[in-house]
Amino acid sequence: DKSISAIGNIGKPVLDFLDQKIDIAIIEISSFQIEASSRLESEIGILLNIEEDHIDRHKSFEIYKSIKLRILQESNFNISKLEHKIAGKEFYDYENYFPESRFLNNPALKEWPIHDVFNLKACLSALKFILEDKENLQILDVNDFLDKAIGIIASFEKLPHRFEVLENVNGITYVNDSKATNFDATLKSIESSRNLNKQGNIYLICGGDLKEQNLENKNAAIFKDIKKCFIYGKDKGSIKESLSHFTNCVLCADLDSAYSLAKKESQIGDIVLLSPACSSTDMFEDYRERGLRFKELVKRS
């Protein structure tokens, strides 16, 4: 049996595990932590995406991107869906290895949000590498491997605040995606909401600290899928200015008032989605407190 721990930016500091015997450490590392590290030297490096974020800290997207790419540059084996080489290294493209059709046919993943399916593909790619390269186990039937792995993973309890589908109240579905702290995450959340319900209207609650994201470069046309957007927080004016070309926008004093208005306008079959696209620190301690507040409001309904 192997000792495996998931640590790092998910809430368990790496330094707390220095004295523990761990065979495999799965470390989620942020751009802040990479920037402060002299070297990474991981066996497997997984880069899920590079989308504009934390520009208030890193000053430009190019600097932010160069920091994130160190995950691939300083690892022995790389997993990514980027379409180019970095520092002369080839990447293992998990998108090509596990094509969409193999996932769509699995009923266990039918209601998974899009970004979770991407994450699962990367996870399975890493698992396949570990089993074949480190454990000397040859996986002859990829479909069989996939079915067994998905069966196990689908039984896991999902983490809160990540496209968390809450109870259906009076025919309205409430979704807590407070972990969406940039616009690219919110775009994926809107797509996942449409997959969840093909017919109903989607009412979006968003806002907070934009962290100097440049909304000009975003695929904001997807906001046409939104019936109405309720915006609160520090940068609500800038967000409204960008999104009002695509959907109706309403400025709100805070999350509570945004929720109240969204609840009032929504009808049976609709979705009320909290996917802020911003940091929470202008009004909350973190995304967890923001998500818990939203869940409280839904529970009172």
Regions found by a protein language model. Give the residues of each.
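Walker A (P-loop) phosphate-binding motif
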Residues: D1-N9
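Residue-level signal for inorganic ion chemistry
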Residues: N9, E28, L48, Y64, ...
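Flexible active-site lid/hinge loop adjacent to a nucleotide/diphosphate
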Residues: I10, D19-P113, T281-M283, Y287
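Short glycine-rich anion-binding loops that position phosphate/pyrophosphate groups of nucleotides
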Residues: S31-Q33, E52-D53, H84-K85, T181, ...
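Short internal beta-strands
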Residues: I79-E83, I202-G207, D225-K234
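Nucleotide phosphate-binding/pyrophosphate-handling subdomain across enzymes
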Residues: W112-I226
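C-terminal helical cap/extension that packs against the catalytic core
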Residues: N214-D270
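Glycine/aspartate-rich loop-and-adjacent alpha/beta segment that forms the canonical ThDP
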Residues: A277-S301
